[in-house]
Structures are given as structure tokens and as C-alpha cells.
Amino acid sequence: MARNHITPELALDALSPVAAFRNGASFTDKTSKGVTSPAWAWNKSTLNPKNRINSLSPSHHPTWRLDGCTSLGTQFYTAPTFFSPVRPLHIHTFIPTPSQWPLGLRSLLGIDSAFLYRDSRINNFHIAQYVLRTLEHWSSTIHDFQSMYEALPFGSRIVFENIENDITKIRIRIVRTHDLERQLMSITSWPSRLTKCPSAILPPTLDISRLHLVQQLHDSTAIVELRRPRTEADIFRKTGTDIVVFKTLSDSPSYLYYELSILLTMPPHPNIIPAPLHIITKKVRFGSKLAIVGFTLPCLSRDSLRDILPRRRIQGSLHLHDQIKWALQVTSALKHIRDKGPGWYCDLRLDNVLLSDSDDVVLIDFEQRGVLPSFAPPEIRYLDCIVALVKDSSLDCGVKEEYKKLYEEHIGPIIDEKIMAEYHGNIPWLCQSRSKREALQVYMLGRLLWCIFEGVSAPQVEIWMEYLYEPEVEFPVFKLTPMELRPLIESCTQGWTQSDNEVKRKGRCLVGTTDGKKYELGVALDAFTKIWKEELERGKMFLKQKTDCQMHNGTVGSAHLDTPSLDKVLETLVNFGKLL
């Protein structure tokens, strides 16, 4: 492992505000675990023939497949292929964090590069074949594996307890998530969630056994094939296909049910994903409850703007009339959500903006979890930091008390986690007024408009993941955006601050922002610690300014009261479109 390469541990720690309160020594100890002399001894070395992994080449007749990963390379979307059909039971494979591995295996399996990739590109690394070969051996030792697998509770986990050169020595256990199934809502109690909109039409229900897993796209989203009797009415006649998207829970069921209620009660809009086609149920073992585990949506064949924008720009097929059309459609969708939907949408990012077959925008994902820091408004970023620090158990009591006070001042009383689970959405957004939420959405829209007109995948290169097309220019630099639209984007993104980031990722390496010099891990951590300390101080000043503004004006404080409304953004885009 090169000392100037990004690692999962560094990415995890450096992207958390907790890094502001950690020292380099403790971090180095953490990432160097297992790097002591025994790991280099001949009897442990991977150069020793007896320690070599039997094979890391793809199997000629694979019995498992891997569709992607998440959680910095510790959670894999795996599925057996030696029986069919496979139901989308959300059973994923989990491995230990790399800090618990023998050092030689970290390098051999390529985890310090592989963790940057979340899609099928993970299969280009040895860790993918290692996981697949291990699952193949493990499943072959279990009698009637199919029956055992299909009887598992929804969302169960296949857990590797250790990582060894010899895959037969890996201890694997199954975590049966009975507690998760107990949290699921029954189909009979679901209508009570729609009392505020009694006219909502419920889609038909289908048992999960009718779905055949085709591909796991993300933690909570899969492409599935609907298996139905020939006599059933063909509700897919319009699309001529039985392929649909299965949306399920990734952790807390509350987010899933909140999204489902929004999609069922919000009036349709041409640029918002339509209401679910089915509600998917599963009979759970305890109490014989028929529980809601997800819903199906139409499957859009096109990619998201995250990949389409840079691809078309590179190919020379990204045209201004398409860009302005997409910008108008996204803004129109946000207005619809404001006026006829839940009132706000905090998940606005490029991978949640898909294209239909007609090349029109379709907005997806209404869990209301929030977005990456690169799209989040400054105020939300700062409040997210406060929430994270209050929840972290490793911090000094004095530090936690300081941020508990900030939490209570700017968010509200600290509520027990179990009670908070009943609230749906991102906590910092929940404490905002209606007008403030619109201003925050306009900020995110401004960042997204910049990406659309610059033809890039994101506002910046991320430390913890690599896009299929890495951004070649970073916000707020303008190169391709029409001059007439630049003032609009600047007014939308008021409050953006240039962080004095000393380090960034270039490929696998950490380099200095100004000189391009490669950083070793200890130096990089010191830089991230400094960055986070400065970010937290900026946050305190920002929130104080907001409070002072509120006290003097008697209104909800805002550092930027002249942020344009969604109506104004739409008007500006329409007027520009008339000039084309």
C-alpha cells in the first residue's frame, strides 16, 4: 500500500467532521493495524506459495455474481446464479473493514483502489473474485442452499467474520434480520397513512415471489422482472416489457414509507417519476404479517444526467437546446413539488435526474435523506456537521456539550433516536421554514444548473468515490456556461464559500491542491483535520450571523435574503430559451 494513496479508512475519517478532533498518530495506528513484523514474516507473506490464494480469475461457471458495492467497499450486492429465479430479498454480503485485514491481502485484493467504485467496475478488482469464490465454496457446503436462502428474513446479511488467504478458513455467518421485519408495516394498516389524502388510489399488491432479480443498481434499487400468469391483464402493454424497478428500504423502513406516501398522493407531473405500479409485500414469519417491503416503478432505459452530460460533451452531442430544456424541466418539477407535493425536495443531485426515452428529465428518489456535501447548501452542511458530532460517541464530553448547545439552538431539543425515527426526512431540513426551504432548494438547483451547462458529472472531484466521468472543471469556474446564465447561477448559489482545501484526490493519490505534490497519509490527515476545523468555525460564524439577523429583523434569519425564487429562476430560463 503506497503511503500517498487514499484508503477507505482515510476517506471515512477525513469526510467526517469528527476528523477535526483526531490526531494523526491515532489515525496512523488505525490504518497500520496488522502491519507489524509478523505480517511480513515468511510464514505470513503472500510470496510464500502456501499462502497464495488459489485463484482470483473469473470462474468459467460462476455460481454467484456481484453487481456493485457500497459502504467504502465493505458491502457487496451479491446474488446466487445456480438457481433461478432469485427473489430480490435484499440479501447482501458484508466483509470486515480493511484495517482488520493482513496487510499483504489489502494489496493483493486491491481494496484500496476498489472502494472508489460503486458499480459493476468493482468486478475489475481481485476483491470481487475473492468474495465470489468464497461464496461459491461456502454455499456448496450447505445442503439445499436454495431453500435456506429463500427462507431468510428480508434484508438478512451474509457476513465474513475474517479475511484469510485460504478462503476455506473464512468464517461466514448469516445475520437474520427478524427485528427489521418486525418494523415493517402491514398492508392492512397502510391506508391509515393516507388519511390526509383519501382520494389516493392504491396500486395493486404483489408478493415478492413474483419478482425475479435482474440487477441490483444501488443499495435500495434493483431492476427486476415481473413474473405473472398469462391470464393476468397486461398493465405493461404501454411499454411492452415486464422489466420494472423495485424500490425497497436500505435501512430504516420510515424513509421507504414516506417516499411511497409522497408518490401516491402527489398529483402527476411529466418530469417526476409516476406513482408506483405495485406495492410489494412479503409474509413475515413472526405474526404472519403481510408486510410492505417496497414498490415497483417504470424502468427508464436511459442513464442519469451524471453520466449523460459528460458523455455527450465528450462526444460533441451535448446541445444547448437540450441543456436549457432539462434546466426548465427540473425547475418546473421543483415548483410542482412546492405547490402540489410535500413542499420541498432535498435529494436534488445529478444521479437523481434520469432521462426518458424521449430525452426528457424524470426526477426520482423522494426519501428526503439529503444530498452529498458537494450539492448541499452551506447551512445544511453546517447543521449536518452538528448532528453528526452530537451522535458520535468517541468525542470528548466537552466537545459534545458545545455541539449539543448548538443543536438545541439551531435545530431543536435533542430527541431520542427511537422517537426521531418517526420523523421522516433530513433533520436539518425539517427545522426550516417553508420560505427557507425554497431558498435552500434554489441553492441546490444552482449547483445542478452549473453542472448541466458545464457538461460535467459533479461540482467537484470526490475524495471517497470515482465517477465514471470525473469532472474536468470544478465549481464555481465557468467555461461553457452561456454568459447570460452565469449571473443566475451565481445568485442561486450565494453563500458558497471556497474552502482552503490543501489536498484533493487525483486518481488513487492524494495531492496538494496548488502544487500537485503527492501527500503521504499522515500529512493528508493533518490537512483534513485543519480543513474540518476551519469548516466548523465557518459554520459557527454562519449560524451566529443567521441568529443575529433573526433577532434584528424579527424574521427567520438568512445570510442571503435576495436568493431568487423558483418562479424567478424559471422565468429567467424561459426568457433565455426564447433567444435560441
Predicted regions: what is each one?
Residues P253-S254, I273-D322:
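Conserved structural core of kinase catalytic domains
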Residues I337-S356:
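Catalytic-loop of the protein kinase fold
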Residues N352-Q368:
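Conserved protein kinase catalytic/activation segment
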Residues A376-L383:
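Regulatory activation segment
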